[in-house]
Every structure is written in C-alpha cells, then in structure tokens.
C-alpha cells in the first residue's frame, strides 16, 4: 500500500509540473515580446530535447543507477533551470535567450516521462490492470495545476513558472523515497547499450514499427492542440485553465475504463479509435473557432480523454509488453523520443508555420507592436485576432492529416483474424459478465520474455527484435 501511494504521488506531481505551464505559457509569453515564430520554438525546444535525452537517460536507469534516483536528480536540476528561465523573463531577456533555457530544462524533463512509467511498471505485477490506476493520478495532477492557475490568477502571468519550480523541486526530493527500481547491472555494458540502441531492435517487429510510425505522425497534429487551443479558449472568453482541464477530467474517466476496453477492443481498435477522435476534435475546432461557438470548442476539449488514453496510454502499455525486461526503460525512452521528440518537433514547427500562414500580415505586424501593459488594447487585439485568422483552415489541416494517419494505421497494422477472434473470445468480448480487469491482461498476450519479441499477430522472433 505504501508503494502504491508513493507511485500515485509521483504521477500526480509528474504531470502537475507539466500542466502548470505548458498549455497556458503562450498567454504570458506573448506579453513579453514572443511572436508566433518564437512560440513555435518554445514548443519545439521540448521535442528537440526529447530526441536527445530519453534513450540515454533510459540506458542509465537500465544499466547504471536506480531509476527513481535518476528521476530525482533530473527533477531537482529541472526545478533549478525553470527558476533560471523565470529570472530571465523578469530581467527582460530576449525570446531566443529564454528559449535556450527552456530547451535545457526540457532535456531534464522529457526523460522523466519515460522514467516515471518505468518506476511504476517495474513495481507492479500486472501493468494492464494496475498501471491505469496509478497513471490516472497524473491526469489529476494536470487538473490540479489547471485549477491552481485559475484560482490563483496565474493563467496569464509569470507566476505559473514559479509554481512549476516548486512542484519540480518537490518531486525531486520525493523521488529518493520511491520504491527501489534498481538497474540491471549483471553484465558489462556494451557500446550499443551506452548509446541506448538496444531498444531500436523493437523496430524490427513490423507491427511495432507501424505503431511507432503512426505515433510519430499523430504527434504532428497533436502539437496544434498544445500550442494553439488555449488561445482559442481565451478568445471565446472562457476560463482558460479550467476549460482546458475538462479534457483531463474526461481522461480520468477513460483511463479507469482502459482495462474494460482492452478486453473488448484489443490493441489495434484502441489505437484506431484514439486517432479517429483526434481528427474529430480538430474538425470541431475548425467549425467552432471562427464563430466562437463555445459548445463546439468545449466539446473539442472534452474528447481529450479518448484521444490521449486510447492512443498514448495504450501505446505505453503495448511498449512495456513488447520490450524485454532489461531494456524497458530504454523502450519507454524510445517511445518518448520518437513521439514527443521527433513527432512533436515537426508538429511544433508546422503549427507555427500554419498559424503564421493563416494570420494576415496586417495583424502579424499589429501583434508585434502591442504594448500588453495597456489591458484594453491587449484584449482588443485578441478579439481582432479571432476575426482575422482563418481558423477553419488552421484547424482543418490537422483534422485531415489525423484522418490520413488513421487510414494508414488501420490498413498497415495487421492482426491475424483468427488470433483476433480467439482474443475476443478469451477476453470475454462476448461475455458481459467477464471481469474486465482480469481479462484485460489477456488482451495483449503473449507477454514478451527476455530476448524474445512477439508481433501482434502472435508470430515471434527469438533474436531480440
């Protein structure tokens, strides 16, 4: 019970840290001279860090140091870096200088997304059954951050970054009392292991390769949501952080339902539903944003639970089952690197470009000359932005792209029909009285043993790939 409570606290703070600034940052940064291109680089800094750091940090946790200690060091360092970034903002540093500090901070933060998963999964007996119960506290942490931002009136000012510092330092300290998650140090590390390349062997499995390619591609439109959606909410005159937190409330509900849906849908359908709802959400924004139709905007936020849980949480569990035990931290790091790293980097730059393309040049010039100390002028400029930006095109592009990714995945990700029907039978798909938490663990069988990787079809290679 003690371990469960500690792991829940870890997940709560892990996502409180992220939620405390990541969605609402543009609402403040635009007041200190950041334009659309600068914001694009702010959101590209994390993905670049995600490309560089997670595999290496995962390798350290796999081979040299207990994962919870690595997690603690990274958050303590990250808290200090976020404080330094905040000081840079206070002192009027340029957007480029601030973005450099953001980049270094994200080098410390992004690997902790995979490390927290590793610490949790290595201290549970059944990841399909137990992981959602712990991971849901991450969502609650994000929600708590959103409510704190609104209640403390931090949504559009620098205090959001101070709150992030405190949360990061707190988790850094708490990490050292988390359940011990020792490194696998039975053998001498090879150069391949030092470079964190062992996890790349997972890509030899065709089904996993298709999953990973689809994950990278779906993270391109994902960047639009994190980067732009909060400003649509603000311009619809809705409370920013609280409205954005509706997505996390739906995430809580669907997180707890994951074992139930695993038992009835299986991996492929779970992932496909997640991608399909991404396309639906952007279609809702494309229709609702131009006329400030609050119902459609809020509905687009509310479906976040399906978008995130059915694709990303399913993918984390799928990766945990595919990877041999000695490289599971690296495997989670690979997933973070290629999705929140490569995919989100491309998405951040594309979103910045598309936003600029859909913003008339006359407004772009006005935006750069706004003196945000004049509150009335600032609000007027926001309303002007809503009227002038081509929101239908801006959100229509990621909607079509997400739909195309769904088609690619559904066609390319092959399951053996015989195995699929057997799985439905075994998991109680036709038995409404079956225990979903018990049968969910069967939905991803067979579990990968060390040195063996199995495709979703049930075919196995015994060469580590």
Regions found by a protein language model. Give the residues of each.
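C-terminal ends and interior cores of transmembrane alpha-helices
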Residues: 73-92, 277-290
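Hydrophobic core of transmembrane alpha-helices in multi-pass small-molecule transporters
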Residues: 12, 81, 93-115, 119, ...
């Amino acid at each position: 019970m003690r371990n469960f409570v500690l792991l829940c606290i870890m997940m709560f703070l892990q996502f409180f840290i992220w939620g405390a600034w990541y969605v609402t940052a543009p609402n403040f940064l635009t007041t200190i001279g950041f334009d659309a291109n600068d914001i694009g680089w702010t959101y590209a800094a994390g993905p670049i860090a995600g490309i560089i750091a997670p595999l290496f940090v995962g390798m350290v946790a796999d081979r040299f140091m207990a994962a919870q200690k690595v997690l603690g060091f990274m958050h303590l360092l990250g808290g200090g870096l976020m404080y330094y970034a905040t000081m840079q903002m206070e002192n009027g540093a340029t957007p480029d200088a601030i973005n450099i500090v953001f980049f270094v901070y994200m080098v410390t933060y992004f690997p902790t997304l995979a490390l927290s998963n590793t610490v949790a999964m290595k201290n549970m007996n059944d990841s399909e059954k137990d992981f959602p119960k712990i991971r849901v506290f991450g969502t609650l942490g994000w929600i708590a951050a959103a409510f704190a931002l609104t209640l403390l009136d931090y949504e559009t000012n620098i205090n959001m970054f101070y709150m992030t510092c405190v949360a990061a330092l707190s988790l850094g300290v708490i990490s050292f009392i988390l359940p011990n998650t020792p490194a696998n140090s039975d053998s001498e590390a090879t150069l391949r292991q030092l470079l964190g390349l062992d996890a790349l062997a997972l890509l030899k499995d065709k089904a996993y390769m298709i999953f990973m390619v689809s994950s990278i591609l779906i993270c391109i439109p994902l960047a639009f949501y994190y980067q732009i959606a909060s400003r649509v909410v603000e311009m619809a005159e809705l409370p920013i952080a609280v409205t954005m937190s509706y997505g996390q409330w739906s995430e809580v509900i669907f997180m707890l339902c994951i074992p139930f849906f695993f038992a009835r849908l299986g991996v492929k359908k779970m992932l496909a539903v997640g991608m399909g709802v991404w396309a639906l959400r952007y279609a809702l924004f494309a229709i609702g944003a131009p006329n400030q139709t609050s119902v459609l905007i809020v509905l687009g936020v509310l479906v976040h639970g399906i978008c995130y849980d059915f694709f990303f949480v399913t993918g984390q569990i799928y990766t945990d089952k595919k990877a041999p035990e000695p490289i599971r931290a690296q495997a989670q790091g690979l997933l973070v690197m290629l999705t929140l790293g490569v995919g989100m980097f491309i998405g951040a730059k594309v979103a910045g470009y598309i936003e600029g393309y859909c913003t008339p040049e006359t407004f772009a010039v006005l935006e750069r000359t706004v003196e945000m100390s004049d509150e009335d002028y600032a609000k007027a400029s926001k309303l002007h932005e809503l009227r002038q930006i081509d929101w239908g095109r801006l959100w229509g592009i990621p909607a079509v792209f997400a739909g195309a990714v769904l088609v690619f995945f559904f066609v390319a990700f092959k399951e053996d029909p015989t195995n699929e029907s057997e799985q439905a039978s075994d998991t109680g798909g036709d038995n409404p009285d079956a225990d979903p938490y018990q049968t969910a663990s069967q939905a991803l069988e067979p579990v990968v043993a060390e040195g063996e990787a199995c495709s979703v079809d049930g075919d196995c290679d015994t060469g580590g790939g």
